[in-house]
Amino acid sequence: MAHNPEERNNDKQKALDNAISQIEKAFGKGAIMKLKQNPVEKIDTISTGSIALDSALGVGGLPKGRIIEIFGPESSGKTTLALHVIAEAQKKGGLCAFIDAEHALDVIYARKLGVKTDDLVISQPDTGEQALHIVEYLVCSSAVDVIVIDSVAALTPRAEIEGDMGDQHMGLQARLLSHGLRKLTSVVSKANCILIFINQIRMKIGVVYGNPETTTGGNALKFYTSIRLDIRKVGAIKDKENITGNETRVKVVKNKVAPPFREAKFDIMYNEGISKLGEIIDIGAKLGVLEKAGAYYSYNNTRLGQGRENVKSYLKANKEIASEIETKIRDLFKNHDNSIAIEEEREQLLEESVF
């Protein structure tokens, strides 16, 4: 029997190596390894379509191999944000699927956001069980980069559909999701796929203190997600008397890959989606990439125009310049380790109860 510490450590190491060898024989190579054998590399991400939100997420977008939840009130931009993620994935040559449990996907609107609808795989399942089985098959194929489920509230259990209208089905949906997510978590990671759940908000009954809002589907989704995004409409964008879009705020209420509680603000324009040009102007001016003198904006001593809308029109017509400015902004975010993410009201966010 070994008595000195070095011999004891050697014996332990031999025993561990033997155990690892047996595990690899039983479950295949890669089932277990030391961390140094698989060094932590830069997280592979897909952009959200918003520069500010990519920065607020801390890693430059949504991380692959993770489960994401986007939740918020009605007409706040949840589906719009998810469709932008699909469009960005398709730009990289990725394959995407949309599980339309609400049976409400607007194909024409999706095209306007840049989604290649001809290449988009779509399913309109009849029950929640069917939806989760379809997702499992798609994930296990390892061919799909992004899967969006719209929405959790519409994942109706089979027993509820087959039952009578007035029947009580307490906790059925929560159990369905809990069981489904247990199976999906590991396969999503292995397939390096982003699984996005769109969720709705409900009010808790009888809550006097604290936040009365909660999301549908029980608590399982809150635990299994790596990122939870709370999206809200905070104002209207007007062109004279006509409302042309919404000012939108997204709070990163949970983040397992970077510091949470950051927030991003951007515009969602009707029939256009996230206004990337608006972000380029606002963030570019804030970071000094664009020079602003009064209402005039300049870039590299070239005057872009007077007023935000005129500059947007100029950048729309000169896409190369817009792309160059965007690249400089993203490089600045990377170099500053994302510390300049839009984090207004950070202290207030930390005090709020995160459900």
Swiss-Prot record:
Supply the SMART domains for this chain. Answer: AAA
Family, as annotated: Belongs to the RecA family.
GO MF annotation, one: damaged DNA binding
Task: Name where it's found.
Answer: Cytoplasm
In terms of NCBIfam families, this protein maps to: tigrfam_recA (TIGR02012)
Q: HAMAP family attached here?
A: RecA
**Entry keyword set:** ATP-binding, Cytoplasm, DNA damage, DNA recombination, DNA repair, DNA-binding, Nucleotide-binding, SOS response
Q: Which residues bind ATP?
A: G72, P73, E74, S75, S76, G77, K78, T79
Q: Which GO terms describe its cellular component?
A: cytosol
SUPFAM superfamilies per the UniProt record, alphabetical: P-loop containing nucleoside triphosphate hydrolases (SSF52540), RecA protein, C-terminal domain (SSF54752)
Q: What's this protein's name?
A: Protein RecA
